[in-house]
């Protein structure tokens, strides 16, 4: 039975590799493998398509590899260490998804792109430093990395993508660089361990559910650059007692009255004294009129 399972897994991996090379998700019968392999398009052989031995505990990616393909190491649940060479510039979607035992990874300075769900479900990861040349972090890139306690986001990033760090329950603090202009929906949703968030001075949009269920947050400062706050952006942050808008020159748009639902009963929203009346009367803000207080800088 074990031998049959091993053969089945092997054939599945071969099919996955062929489909990745072709860029086609159409199922491939095992009987067609010889024809499919012969007809594979020529191209860049520096792309690591798939790890055939899914039971490997360690792997060193060959020097000269420039891209780690989509799902290359997905579900390699026993993989504990990986060496990525300095030639790699791109980590594909789901490349290391659900590598539960992977405890650390060093992303080389050569990498510029981290694909969607690249490290999703890597519950053993405790810290990640994203290199300064990375300009794109995909959707759900680090989703459900529950063991992650620290993350360094470089200044090269301009947007925190949807669910990028969703359910990273071990994260205690995060600093969003000044070049970031948007925090997309559910970016830090359910990061229950977060106690400190620093939002950069270029952020204009805080998306839907961006910090929902961040139950460890007690206070947060929203920079004056923010013009829009989405649905349930801070909903169910049950210990949130202070939100500071004191550097704002205008009232930001609140997408819905639920933006701060189920926060602390003692929540105080600090705004510039000169804008208190306007703030209390603004659409959707009026729901929180009794929590809005004016402060002088």
Report residues per predicted region:
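Short, surface-exposed loop and linker segments with low hydrophobicity and enrichment for Pro/Ser/Thr
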Residues: 40-42, 73, 237, 257-267
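Structural signature of tandem-repeat unit edges
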Residues: 52-67, 77-90, 100-113, 123-136, ...
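Short, aromatic/basic amphipathic alpha-helical patches
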Residues: 256-260, 277-289
């Amino acid at each position: 039975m074990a031998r049959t399972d091993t053969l089945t897994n092997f054939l599945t991996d071969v099919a996955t590799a062929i489909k990745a090379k072709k860029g086609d998700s159409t199922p491939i019968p095992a009987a067609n493998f010889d024809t499919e392999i012969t007809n594979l398009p020529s191209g860049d052989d520096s792309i690591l398509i798939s790890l055939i031995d899914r039971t490997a505990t360690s792997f060193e990616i060959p020097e000269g590899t420039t891209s780690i393909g989509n799902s290359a190491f997905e579900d390699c649940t026993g993989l504990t260490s990986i060496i990525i060479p300095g030639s790699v510039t791109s980590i594909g979607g789901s490349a290391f998804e659900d590598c539960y035992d992977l405890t650390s990874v060093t992303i080389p300075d050569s990498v510029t792109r981290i694909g969607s769900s690249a490290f999703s479900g890597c519950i053993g990861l405790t810290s990640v430093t994203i290199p300064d040349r990375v300009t794109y972090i995909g959707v759900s890139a680090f989703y459900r990395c529950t063991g992650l306690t620290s993350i360094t986001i470089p200044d090269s990033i301009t947007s925190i993508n949807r669910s990028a760090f969703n359910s990273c329950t071990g994260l205690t603090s995060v600093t969003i660089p000044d070049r970031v202009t948007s925090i997309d929906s559910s970016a830090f949703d359910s990061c229950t361990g977060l106690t400190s968030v620093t939002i950069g001075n270029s952020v204009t949009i805080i998306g839907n559910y961006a910090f929902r269920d961040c139950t460890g947050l007690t206070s947060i400062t929203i920079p004056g650059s923010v013009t829009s706050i989405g649905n349930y952006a801070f909903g169910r942050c049950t210990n949130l007692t202070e939100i500071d808008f004191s550097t704002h020159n205008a009232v930001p748009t609140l997408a819905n009255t639920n933006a701060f639902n189920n926060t602390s009963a003692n929540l105080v929203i600090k705004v510039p004294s000169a804008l208190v009346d306007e703030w209390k009367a603004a659409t959707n803000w009026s729901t929180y009129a009794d929590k809005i207080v004016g402060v002088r800088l």
